[in-house]
Amino acid sequence: MKKMKLLQGVILGGCLFLGLFFLPSIGANAASVTMDGVRYWLIDWDSEAKGHAELDPDSDLSEVYIRNEVEFLGKSYPVGSFWWDEDDFMVDSDDSFAEGWGQADLKETNTAHESLRKITFAPGITVQGRAISFKKLEEVVFEGEVSYMDEVSYFNCPKLKTIVLPSSYGEPVYRSEFAIDIKRCPSVQIVAEESNPHFQVIDNDVYSKDGTILYNVTSNAKKYEVEEFVRHIGEYAFNGNNTIRSVTMPDSVQTVGRYAFGEMKKLSSIRLSKSLRKLEEGVFLGSKKLKKLDVPKNIKRFDGDFGWKKNKFKKMIIRTKNMKKSSFYDLSKKCTVYVRNKKVKRQLRKFDFDGKIVVKKKK
C-alpha cells in the first residue's frame, strides 16, 4: 500500500509536468481512476502486469462491480486483481497478522465498510488479502471462475452468506499460501467444489480431503469436540473464534499448528491430546480466559510466545519427566507451574521462566 501511494505521487508529479491534469468527472489521474465505488490502479510497478482494483473507502454504494478492463484517455487497461484493504484495519500498521486476529482493529471503519452489501468480480479477477469488518456484506460473486491469490480470508462479516472454495485452490503450505481463515461470520455457509482435490467441508468446518487435517473452524458452538478422525489441527484453525468456551481434543490428534487456539475470547478450558509431542509457537496467544492448562506427559517441548500480558495463565501442570529445548520467558509470572521432578524444574529455569515452580510427584 505504501509503495503504491509513493508511486502515485511520483507518477502524478510527472504527469503534471507534462500537462496532464485531473479529470474531475471521474476523479482520475495517470496512476489511478475512481469510478462506481472502485479505485483502479492502471499503472503498476511491473510494467507488464495487469492493474488492480480496491474499494473507494468513501463510497456509500451497497453494490459494486469490479471490472476486468478500464477505459481511460482513449486507452484500454486490463485489470487482473482486487485487493481488500486489510492494511487499514490493523492495530499497528508496522506489524502483521502473523500472530493471528488479535492484530485486527475492530474499532476501525469507513463508509465502504458500513455500506457494502454485494461485491461482484468480472471474469479473470483474482482476489487478494483479508476482508475485515464489512458489517452489511452478504454476497461475494464471481462471474467467472472463483479465484483467490493467497488465502480465502473473511473476518467479522456478520451477514456474509456463502463462500466457495474453488477446485483450483491449492493445498495449504503455510498461512500466506492457500490458507483458509474465516472467523466471526456467523451466517456464512462454506462450500467446497467437489472437484477440489484438497478440501472438504463438514458441518461448515474445513478439512483436508481425507479428513485428517482440520484447517478452519467456523463453528458458533460453545463446546467444541474435535472429530476422532482428525490427526492434525492446522495453523490458526480456531484463531479469532469468539463463541467457543471449551475444546475437547481426542488422542488421535498428533500435531497442532502455530497460533491454532489464539485470540479465542471465550475459551476457558481445553483438553489436549495425549499423542501430542510439542506445543507450537503462540498456540494460545491472546486467549485470556484460559487460566489453567494440563499438559500431557508426551509433550516435551514448548515453542513459546505466550505474549506476556496476552496470557492470563494461573496454573499449568507439566506431566513430562524431561523437557527438550523450549521457551518460557514470556509466560506470566503470576502462573504457578507444577512439575513432576526437580529435573524439569531446573529445565524451566534454563528456559527462562521466572515464576513459581512446584515439584509435585505423581502419587
Model feature map: region roles:
Residues 30, 35, 58-80, 91-104, ...:
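Structural signature of tandem-repeat unit edges
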Residues 33-43:
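Short N-terminal segments immediately surrounding and downstream of signal-peptide cleavage
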